[in-house]
């Protein structure tokens, strides 16, 4: 049984939650998110809280209950505060800039990379080496940051590439040389 799924989700002021069949819509100051809910799970609003209920108790239903609770809690958090991921670029000549809704990256390749940001995602570049990805959908923010990182993953010898700000690169020693 999911312990996470049993906890109610608090609805902050300024956020409205509407349930229609197997679809939940959360509206808040930063925007609106909609998601389909897994069959066998139902949501109930009780005052300023959302309760996640299972139609029948079982191992799979308990797992889905915890999943749905976490997803809806992330939706509520997203429309109130939003989410952000910070990426850092390390390397000589590596830089980034935002042009409209696209991110231009120079990462040591023979060509610049132009990445069109998904709808609902904004990016900000500080000092050409720090990228801040923001949005209200946690899943989309994480996927966008992972896609940007995948253009040049950090390598273990010099640490060049795109990495998350909180990520620690385990460095390797170079060749030992002749003996």
Curated annotation (Swiss-Prot):
Record's keyword annotation contains Mitochondrion: no
Keywords (A to Z) from UniProt: Ribonucleoprotein, Ribosomal protein, RNA-binding, rRNA-binding
Bridged cysteine pairs (disulfide): none
GO MF annotation: an example: structural constituent of ribosome
Any one GO biological process: cytoplasmic translation
GO cellular component, one term: cytosolic large ribosomal subunit
Pfam families assigned to the protein according to its UniProt record, in alphabetical order: Ribosomal_L6
Keyword RNA-binding: yes
Subunit structure of this chain's protein: Part of the 50S ribosomal subunit.
Family: Belongs to the universal ribosomal protein uL6 family.
Function: This protein binds to the 23S rRNA, and is important in its secondary structure. It is located near the subunit interface in the base of the L7/L12 stalk, and near the tRNA binding site of the peptidyltransferase center.
Protein name (database record): Large ribosomal subunit protein uL6
Source species: Syntrophotalea carbinolica (strain DSM 2380 / NBRC 103641 / GraBd1)
Gene behind the chain: rplF
């Amino acid at each position: 049984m999911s312990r996470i799924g049993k906890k109610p989700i608090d609805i902050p002021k300024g956020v409205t939650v509407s349930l229609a069949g197997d679809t939940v819509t959360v509206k808040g100051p930063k925007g609106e998110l909609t998601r389909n809910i897994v069959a066998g799970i139902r949501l109930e609003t009780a005052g300023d809280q959302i309760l996640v209920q299972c139609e029948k108790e079982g191992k799979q239903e308990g797992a889905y209950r915890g999943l749905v609770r976490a997803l809806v809690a992330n939706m509520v958090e997203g429309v109130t505060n939003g989410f952000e991921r910070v990426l850092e670029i390390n390397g000589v000549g590596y830089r980034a800039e935002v042009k409209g809704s696209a991110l231009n990256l120079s990462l040591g390749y023979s060509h610049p990379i132009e990445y069109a940001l998904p709808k609902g995602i904004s990016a900000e570049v500080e000092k050409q080496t720090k990228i801040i990805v923001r949005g209200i959908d946690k899943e989309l923010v994480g996927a966008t940051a992972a896609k940007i990182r995948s253009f040049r993953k950090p390598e273990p010898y010099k640490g060049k590439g795109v990495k998350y700000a909180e990520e620690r690169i385990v460095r390797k020693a170079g060749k030992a040389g002749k003996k």
